[in-house]
Amino acid sequence: MADWPVKSLGDKTLLQYAKTPYMDKLARMGRNGRLITVAEGFHPGSEVANMSVLGYNLPKVYEGRGPLEAASIGVDLKPGEMAMRCNLICVEGEILKNHSSGHISTEEADVLIQYLQEKLGNDRVRFHTGVQYRHLLVIKGGNKELDCTPPHDVPLKPFRPLMVKPLVPEAQE
């Protein structure tokens, strides 16, 4: 409910100036506190916060956005398969212009994901179409020791340093 101060209202915002008896009553009767939804050592993404609020033990079960994306599009993961969220992004020159590939439609994205599957997919690597810019990459026997930067966290940055990087030699493949 952020707003700018209005000079004619004594430099108050509209909410500060408004008569708000019901909100005032709620504030008097209510309690507040701090809910920490991101466990120490975890990236503060929505998937982490939501899983935490739902009671999941993140150190035991969290594997990134990939398994959530798989479940959301009906892809059953088998033991030994690694699921990774596969975002379509928009790059202009060397810069990550936006994380949503210019708000690409699911139909347009499906053409690109099917192309990736045709050119790069095999018995070990599979691409699955999701919704709009959010898709899925499944790798059999994939090593999870990777450094992945969520594109929505780094708009307008050079994209090459943000590419997925292996943290151990075994994750190079």
Segments from the language model and where they lie:
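Glycine-rich, mobile lid/loop segments that gate access to catalytic sites or pores
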Residues: I89, S100-E173
